[in-house]
Regions:
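Glycan-processing catalytic domains of CAZymes
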Residues: 1-212
Length: 212
């Protein structure tokens, strides 16, 4: 920011939770945000995962998809977002939201935690705002005409060209690409659009396991 004060730095809170969270103390401010009595304890991995084994160990052993309907998960997301904002970051990517909402289909809990994060940013962020985005294979999350995110994001989904090695195109309708599918509505900032602007990621997955 000293070199370029207009730069927006982005952090992320992804669709993964590991047992490492058991080593992170919960600050009193996080308890208080959720109207809970502050206590001397760490975050609890088992209180964040889906019950009945759903999406548990989804990524690898002791690395699961968090369940946003659980208070502990909401506390974790608020805690990480707060740390990003306190560090001067002004944008947060929330990963694959639509695999963290299996028990929150109306996104009541997602909207609640997003509202808490935005409220904190309004008081503490560099420019009193945080821009939030996520991967949205559905095209976007909209309730009562209101978009949940400031922008959408998705992998670019390049389509290989038969007989033309090393060449690819970005094609509307190919695979689950977002082109032409980004939902519109009223943004968190209050302006309206027919299709929310989005980011496409050139390299979302790293190197291929079947190069060539």
């Amino acid at each position: 920011h000293k070199m370029d004060p207009d730069v927006i730095l982005q952090g992320a809170i992804f669709e993964i939770i590991t047992t490492d969270v058991n080593n992170v103390p919960i600050p009193a401010s996080v308890f208080e945000e959720f109207d809970l009595m502050p206590g001397n304890r760490n975050f609890n991995y088992k209180k964040m995962i889906y019950p009945f084994g759903r999406r548990v160990n989804h990524w690898h052993k002791d690395a699961s998809v968090p369940d946003m309907s659980r208070t502990e998960t909401k506390m974790w997301f608020f805690y990480v977002a707060k740390r990003w904002i306190d560090m001067g970051l002004e944008a947060i990517h929330f990963g694959q939201v639509e695999i963290m909402d299996d028990r929150d289909r109306n996104h009541i809990h997602w909207r609640d935690v997003m509202a808490r994060i935005r409220s904190y940013a309004k008081k503490h962020a560099r420019r009193s705002i945080v821009l939030c985005d996520a991967h949205v294979p559905s095209g976007g999350i909209v309730h009562d005409g209101k978009l949940m995110f400031d922008l959408h994001s998705f992998p670019s989904r390049p389509k290989s060209l038969k007989g033309q090695p090393h060449k690819a195109i970005l094609e509307k309708g190919f695979s689950d690409s977002i082109y032409g599918r980004s939902a519109g509505g009223v943004t968190p900032s209050g302006w309206s659009c027919e299709s929310l602007p989005y980011i496409v990621e050139i390299d979302n997955f790293g190197n291929s396991d079947h190069a060539g």
